[in-house]
Amino acid sequence: MTNYHVSIGEFVTEAGARIPNVEVAYHTWGTFRGDNAVLVEHALTGDQHADEWWPGLIGPGLAIDTRQYFVICTNVLGGCKGTTGPSSPHPDDGEAYGSRFPAISIRDQVEVEYQFLKAIGVEHLFAVMG
């Protein structure tokens, strides 16, 4: 398992709010070969630690075999485990966004994941699950 963060730059929500310097926290398992990426989505209160909340499913020889697949799991926009969200520092004062964090939609979360996948060089997903 590998822990990473990647910046996707500024993100504009579908409501028009601007969030500068969005960082996405994620984990990967396996080796990327261009056509073997599997994106695992977490529950509303989940995080990028899919191997912890799906124990026994991700790994060599398991249902999501990391000898065959490159498995990616992100923490969603607005999440509390490393991706930009209410606990992140606000660019104006360095204090946590808190209630100043803009309202986000599922479309916003999906778009951030799409921008994230482009940023790490994944152009095609073999599967999306969660």
Spans of features found by a protein language model:
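Conserved acidic catalytic loop of the alpha/beta-hydrolase fold
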Residues: D93-R100, R107-F126
